[in-house]
Structures are given as C-alpha cells and as structure tokens.
Amino acid sequence: MADDSKSSNVGSRYAQALFDLASEQKEVPAVEADLKSLKAAIADSRDLRVLLASPAFGADDKRKGLSAIADKAKFKPTTKKFLGLLAANGRAAALPEVISAFERLAAEARGAVSAEVTTALPLSSAQAKGLAQALRQALGKDPEITTRVDPALLGGIKVKVGSRLFDASLRSKLDSLKFALKRA
C-alpha cells in the first residue's frame, strides 16, 4: 500500500513538472494527446508494460524504447524529452500514474473534472451519456470520462474522481457481505 502512495506521489510530481513546462510552451493539448496515445499503447501492449515495470531492463533500454515509440508516434519534442528524463531517472514504471495525474491537471485547467469509470461490461452509449449527466450534476463540472472494463467486478460500477472512489460494484457488495457474515 505504501508503494502505491509513493508511486502516486512521484507520478503527481512529475506530472506537475510536465504540466508546468507544457503550459509555459502553450502545448498542454498536444502533450495531453501524446500521453493519451501512450496510455492506449500501454493498455494494448503487454511488452510495453513489461518494459516499463521490469527491473530486468535498465534505464537506457527503457529510454530507447520510449524514444522509439515517441518517434514513431510523432510526439512533440517536449513529450519525447520528458519520457527520456523519466526513464533516465529510473521512474518509467510510474508512467501510468504520471499520465493519469497529467490528465487530471489538464482537465482542471479546462474547468472539467477527470473521472475514471470501471465496469464489468462495456457501457452502451446511452449508459455513458446518462453517467456523464449524473456526474455533471453531482460534481458541478463537466466530466471527462475514461472507461475501463474489469470482469472481476461481476457487475455494477466504480467511479474514481480525484482521490474519491465511488464503488457500487457487485464484487465490493459481496466482499462486504462476506466480512459481515464472518463477524457475526
């Protein structure tokens, strides 16, 4: 648990530094687009996840790998240099947290709020629209929703907005029931 907090803290600091630099250079939307593209690549590629997380690969290997991705995807020089710095400092494993924190900062700057939604099954367009409307009413800001499917939830939904987590998943309800039965 402490590792998650430490990693998240590191991710937030690096994200803030990148956001400040991108703001100075008026490149926040372009850098955000680069990072969203990289986030999708991380989600799609097991090899990339292994490269980032595995201690078997040195900082130089990680830097070269991220640089090759940045070149192929035609990332902005700001993004490419940042990825190189992250790898050189041995923080490549924190990249997913950096991306999430950067997205939150960019959303806040636009007056929106970033919401990470996890469901057991993909949301239909009507469900996504209803969820966006409910979040807009509850939060008072326009939500920028990122969806993820996790069959382990069994049913229901989890919504993470900033540091708040709204968990209405069947998995958490069953876990609560199991805990209550063990206590009785």
From Swiss-Prot:
Disulfide topology: none
Main location as per UniProt: membrane
Which GO molecular-function terms appear in the entry?
A: proton-transporting ATP synthase activity, rotational mechanism
Q: What does the record say about its membrane topology?
A: Peripheral membrane protein
Entries under InterPro entries matching the protein: ATP_synth_OSCP/delta_N_sf (IPR026015), ATPase_OSCP/dsu (IPR000711)
Q: What are the alphabetically sorted keywords of the record? A: ATP synthesis, Cell inner membrane, Cell membrane, CF(1), Hydrogen ion transport, Ion transport, Membrane, Transport
Its annotated compartments are: Cell inner membrane
Q: Which Pfam families match?
A: OSCP
Instruction: Give the family this protein belongs to, as stated in its UniProt record.
Output: Belongs to the ATPase delta chain family.
Describe its partners and assembly state.
Answer: F-type ATPases have 2 components, F(1) - the catalytic core - and F(0) - the membrane proton channel. F(1) has five subunits: alpha(3), beta(3), gamma(1), delta(1), epsilon(1). F(0) has three main subunits: a(1), b(2) and c(10-14). The alpha and beta chains form an alternating ring which encloses part of the gamma chain. F(1) is attached to F(0) by a central stalk formed by the gamma and epsilon chains, while a peripheral stalk is formed by the delta and b chains.
- PANTHER family recorded for this chain? ATP SYNTHASE DELTA CHAIN (PTHR11910)
Briefly state the protein's biological role: F(1)F(0) ATP synthase produces ATP from ADP in the presence of a proton or sodium gradient. F-type ATPases consist of two structural domains, F(1) containing the extramembraneous catalytic core and F(0) containing the membrane proton channel, linked together by a central stalk and a peripheral stalk. During catalysis, ATP synthesis in the catalytic domain of F(1) is coupled via a rotary mechanism of the central stalk subunits to proton translocation.
Q: What is this protein called?
A: ATP synthase subunit delta
Q: Which organism is it from?
A: Phenylobacterium zucineum (strain HLK1)
Gene, per the UniProt record: atpH
